[in-house]
């Protein structure tokens, strides 16, 4: 089992940290599936849908995350990591709920 991460840009909010692949906007499952396919991945299975909110001093993020099983490697910017790889990367606390879920999934055998 592996999970996809990508490094955020070197400038801006959460610069240089790691994040889960994402797109801006409110997406339902159909739109989320289309976004995944636009990355060159095929959705095999949908496992879960998690919502989260993170408040920065100047902006509020409301997020919906989908846990998927996919086929393909996707764009070169994606790095597929196991549990040790996830633990070795700096993922912002804004994604804490998703980090814990990813960690739990990766540690399951």
What feature does the model see in each segment?
Residues 1-109:
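Intrinsically disordered, low-complexity, charged terminal extensions of DNA damage-control enzymes
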């Amino acid at each position: 089992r592996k999970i996809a991460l990508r490094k955020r840009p070197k400038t801006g909010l959460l610069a240089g940290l790691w994040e889960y692949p994402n797109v801006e906007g409110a997406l339902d499952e159909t739109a989320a599936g289309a976004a995944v396919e636009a990355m060159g991945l095929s959705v095999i299975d949908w496992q879960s849908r998690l919502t989260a909110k993170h408040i920065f001093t100047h902006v509020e993020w409301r997020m919906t995350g989908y846990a998927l099983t996919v086929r393909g490697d996707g764009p070169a910017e994606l790095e597929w990591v196991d549990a040790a790889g996830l633990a070795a990367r700096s993922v912002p606390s804004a994604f804490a709920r998703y980090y814990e879920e990813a960690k739990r999934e990766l540690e399951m055998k």
